[in-house]
């Protein structure tokens, strides 16, 4: 991976297609950087033969004309001009809107590359917006989350973060940490006078307050990440209980192979579906049983791993046969081993059960979980199951209304590290340890918070974040 400069100075001219590849009514090709106005002048002619130069054009102006390459006209286009610093990247930018055929777009982009641009790298436009100070790192990530949002809640959360709500909250906390750090470091300059510029009692209260705010953000990740990643719902149970049939029923199409032969599913299958504004990441797992067969054994091991990562377990039982007490005991054991996961017991094949009502009552009593009667192959009970699943995560679609919410694992880990540093600082304050030791922990917390907004950043971190963007964003 090539290293890219961290400096926010205007970079070389870059160009890329900003709209999805394929056939459409319109497409956009954009340029940014040093010299893009001159490059635009080389390829664009305004309609009607009017004398025109992009170097003289006002910002936020639109111009209709033709764009040509060395072989002649490529297309009629509309050119939008953005003058530095009033652009997304804070550099000079030009965007060409053309017809959306892939050949047209390819020729237009090539004309810009032949005239002096280089092809932009993934996320380079947004990267330049961050480096120039137009947005912070958290807002840059929010743009990516907004683009990839699959539910209304995920979209609204990304919009809130893009507007800077969490950034402002973190900045306020960072200002408090900086103030305490500055007072401690001032003490070091006057160490011979043995003076405290902030009493240790006041410092302990301030650090405790800031740690409490950070811990509240850490706790918000528990539900917040479900908005962007979806609810991890694992379908588990014994072989041939109907797990794959249930997966297909929930998805509304055949995704998994269904067979009467036990052990057909050797590895887990993951798919997503959306119900009542909530996205569920469904995982169909291998049947849970003892097996000496190597491949099936590995599949079962992976099943238990996915169960351990689940937010919601759908434990499916074949109610047409088997010992219900044994099945209830197995469900209880799974729930006890994974108390952080919610569980729904799905009594499948109730159309074949001799006493479905009594069996449901028994399972509800012995598992203390919601029990849904189903005939997955017929779709019976499917709507009730979906409603129960949505009810288990009730309120998730309203989480985006919170003013600040952590949805990213990167942000969660940085905040957790910051909270640990503040915990260390509190212990040092209580023990009346030297100011330099306390200041070190506060500085560590500052750095962790700074990693989120980009105040403290490395080349590797920037590459990791922006390489996930598409070219043109």
UniProtKB/Swiss-Prot annotation:
Subcellular localization: Cytoplasm
Binding locations of GTP: 240-245, 259-265, 284-287
Name this polypeptide is given: tRNA modification GTPase MnmE
UniProt gene name: mnmE
Annotated Mg(2+) binding sites: 244, 265
Cofactors demanded by this protein: K(+)
Domain TrmE-type G: 230-394
Family: Belongs to the TRAFAC class TrmE-Era-EngA-EngB-Septin-like GTPase superfamily. TrmE GTPase family.
Pfam families found in the cross-reference section: MMR_HSR1, MnmE_helical, TrmE_N
Subunit and interaction comment: Homodimer. Heterotetramer of two MnmE and two MnmG subunits.
Keywords, alphabetical: Cytoplasm, GTP-binding, Hydrolase, Magnesium, Metal-binding, Nucleotide-binding, Potassium, tRNA processing
Molecular-function annotations in GO: GTP binding; GTPase activity; metal ion binding
Biological process per Gene Ontology, one example term: tRNA methylation
Source organism phylogeny: Bacteria, Pseudomonadati, Chlorobiota, Chlorobiia, Chlorobiales
Disulfide bridge map: none
Organism: Chlorobium phaeovibrioides (strain DSM 265 / 1930) (Prosthecochloris vibrioformis (strain DSM 265))
Chain's role: Exhibits a very high intrinsic GTPase hydrolysis rate. Involved in the addition of a carboxymethylaminomethyl (cmnm) group at the wobble position (U34) of certain tRNAs, forming tRNA-cmnm(5)s(2)U34.
Any GO CC annotation of this UniProt entry: cytosol
Enzyme class: hydrolase
């Amino acid at each position: 991976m090539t290293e890219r400069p961290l400096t926010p100075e205007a970079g070389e001219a870059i160009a890329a297609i900003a709209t999805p590849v394929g056939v459409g009514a319109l497409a956009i090709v954009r340029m940014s950087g040093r010299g893009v106005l001159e490059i635009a002048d080389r390829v664009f002619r305004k309609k009607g033969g009017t004398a025109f130069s992009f170097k003289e054009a006002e910002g936020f102006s639109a111009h209709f004309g033709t764009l040509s390459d060395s072989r002649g006209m490529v297309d009629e286009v509309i050119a939008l001009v953005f003058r530095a610093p009033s652009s997304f990247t804070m550099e000079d930018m030009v965007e060409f809107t053309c017809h959306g055929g892939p050949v047209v777009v390819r020729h237009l982009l090539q004309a810009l590359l032949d005239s002096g641009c280089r092809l932009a790298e993934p996320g380079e436009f947004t990267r330049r917006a961050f480096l120039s100070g137009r947005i912070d790192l958290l807002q840059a990530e929010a743009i990516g989350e907004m683009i990839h949002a699959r539910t209304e809640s995920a979209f609204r959360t990304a919009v809130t973060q893009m507007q800077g709500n969490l950034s402002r909250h973190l900045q306020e906390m960072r200002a408090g940490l900086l103030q305490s750090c500055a007072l401690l470091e001032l003490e070091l300059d006057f160490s011979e006078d043995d003076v405290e510029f902030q009493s240790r009692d006041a410092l302990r209260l301030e650090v405790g307050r800031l740690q409490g705010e950070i811990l509240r953000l850490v706790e918000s990740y528990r539900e917040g990440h479900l908005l962007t990643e979806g609810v991890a719902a694992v379908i588990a149970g014994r072989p041939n209980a109907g797990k794959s049939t249930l997966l297909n029923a929930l998805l509304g199409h055949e995704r998994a192979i269904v067979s009467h032969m036990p052990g057909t599913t050797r590895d887990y299958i993951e798919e997503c579906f959306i119900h009542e504004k909530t996205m569920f990441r469904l995982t169909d797992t291998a049947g849970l049983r003892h097996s000496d067969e190597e491949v099936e054994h590995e599949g079962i091991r992976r099943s238990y791993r996915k169960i351990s990562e689940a937010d919601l377990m759908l434990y499916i039982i074949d109610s047409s046969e088997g010992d219900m007490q044994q099945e209830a005991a197995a469900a209880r054991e799974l729930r006890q081993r994974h108390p952080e996961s919610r569980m729904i017991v799905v009594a499948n094949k109730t159309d074949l059960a001799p006493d479905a009502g009594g069996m449901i009552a028994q399972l509800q009593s012995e598992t203390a979980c919601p029990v849904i009667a189903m005939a997955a192959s017929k779709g019976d009970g499917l709507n009730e199951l979906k409603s129960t699943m949505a009810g288990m995560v009730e309120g998730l679609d309203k989480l985006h209304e919170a003013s600040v919410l952590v949805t990213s694992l990167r942000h969660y880990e940085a905040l957790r590290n910051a909270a640990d540093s503040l915990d260390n600082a509190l212990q040092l304050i209580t023990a009346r340890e030297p100011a330099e030791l306390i200041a070190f922990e506060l500085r560590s917390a500052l750095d962790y918070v700074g990693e989120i907004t980009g105040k403290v950043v490395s080349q590797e971190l920037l590459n990791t974040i922006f390489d996930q963007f598409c070219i043109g964003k």
